[in-house]
A protein has these predicted regions:
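Active-site Gly/Thr loop motif
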Residues: 194-195, 249-309
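N-terminal export signals
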Residues: 2, 7-22
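Active-site helix/loop module of the DD-peptidase/beta-lactamase fold
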Residues: 83-119, 170-210
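Structured C-terminal helix/loop/strand segments within mature extracytoplasmic catalytic/sensor domains
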Residues: 289-340
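Short, charged, amphipathic alpha-helices and their helix-cap/turn boundaries
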Residues: 51-53, 94, 124-147, 151-153, ...
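Active-site-proximal alpha-helical segments within enzyme catalytic domains
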Residues: 157-165, 211-231, 298-314
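A short, well-structured edge-of-sheet supersecondary motif
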Residues: 29-59, 300-303, 307-311
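Active-site SXXK
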Residues: 47, 64-90, 114, 161-165, ...
Length: 340
């Protein structure tokens, strides 16, 4: 089958920089993705786009919902807050959230515990999957277990983090209206990232666990910043130690850092239907891998050993929420790209 006109035009420069055997691997991975509702696929190495393709409803300048892939922005935003002297990962949340101070368990929660999803607070807060609470609703969520004792995936910790950041911005008088305004000023604007949309709650605050919609290229730019240690055009945009901490796991889940998945044996995934944890052992055999992942198999892969960023976006998020990962395999997809 002949490549689409969009693929051909976009791929002209890529062919010049990627050997023919690499292009063949990328084409095979594209076919695998497209057959599973894929609408965008991009490979970047050492900051240069090697392959880029759009199918179906995908377009180069069309943003696509990241679903829970949105979560990984929070870990890097925390590293920017550390650089600005507004936050420490080891600080108690109760320093900023007085609602936590008199609570047996919540008084011991650190910022890192929130972002590791081991705060002791139920991640879903008793809500159905995809139901995001307001900041106030999340802040009222109780804790019934010691901090660090259990991994609990869901939107509640991210919305609590959003309120914590909002209060810090108000106290510091940064001029940022909310966490998204801060994220935009500190990271998105310097990188040239322009979210197409970002969902907000009934309180007017941006959702941090989901809701971002950006282009494949913009997601790749974000991934490249992380691979580069937070340095862009010679300038450090975040605290390097705090960024490194994004990829340090908790004792409760060896496969999750500060908002990033790190597939390895013993990993606890986001849910029984996600398919992520089931491939943790095989994925660990591909080398060092960090991943932002969302429903519908939205993916941002970071492969430090290859200095490579891979973006995959897909249609059918709602369908995925109902039926799980389907026959998608991260291991198969990455093996096609890497020739592993």
């Amino acid at each position: 089958m002949l490549p689409s006109r969009r693929t051909a035009l976009i791929g002209l420069s890529a062919v010049a920089v990627a050997p023919a055997f690499a292009q063949a691997r990328f084409e095979a991975a594209k076919a695998y993705s497209t057959a599973r509702r894929g609408i965008s696929f991009l490979v970047m190495q050492r900051g240069q786009v090697l392959f880029e393709d759009y199918q179906g409803r995908g377009l180069r300048f069309k943003g696509w919902e990241l679903a829970s892939g949105t979560k990984s922005f929070s870990g890097v935003m925390a590293a920017a807050l550390v650089q600005d002297g507004l936050l420490e990962l080891d600080e108690d949340c109760a320093e900023t959230l007085p609602e936590f101070r008199s609570d047996r368990y919540r008084s011991t929660i650190r910022v890192a515990d929130l972002l590791h999803l081991v705060s002791g607070i139920d991640g879903k807060g008793g809500r159905s999957f995809g139901d995001v609470p307001t900041y106030a609703e999340a802040l009222a969520a109780p804790s019934n277990r010691p901090t660090g004792s259990q991994f609990s995936y869901g939107p509640v910790p991210f919305q609590i983090f959003g309120e914590l950041v909002r209060r810090k911005l108000v106290t510091a008088k940064t001029g940022d209206a909310d966490p998204l305004a801060y994220l935009t000023r500190r990271l998105f604007m310097p990188l040239g990232i322009r979210p197409i949309r970002w969902q907000r709650g009934s309180d007017g605050m941006p959702h941090l666990p989901s809701g971002a919609a950006i282009t494949a290229r913009d997601w790749a730019k974000f991934g490249q910043l992380v691979l580069a240690g937070g340095v862009h055009e010679g300038k450090a945009l975040v605290d390097p130690a705090a960024l490194k901490a994004n990829f340090e796991a908790s004792k409760a889940n060896p496969g999750y850092g500060l908002t990033w998945w790190m597939p390895r044996p013993g990993m606890i995934g986001p849910g029984p239907r996600s398919g992520v944890a089931g491939e943790a052992v095989s994925l660990s055999g591909l080398g060092k891998l960090y991943m932002a992942a969302g429903a519908g198999n939205q993916r941002l892969y970071l492969l430090p050993d290859q200095d490579m960023v891979i973006v995959r976006q897909a249609d059918g998020i709602a369908q995925s929420l109902r039926g799980g990962a389907g026959d998608w395999s991260d291991q198969k997809f990455l093996s096609l790209i890497l020739g592993a």
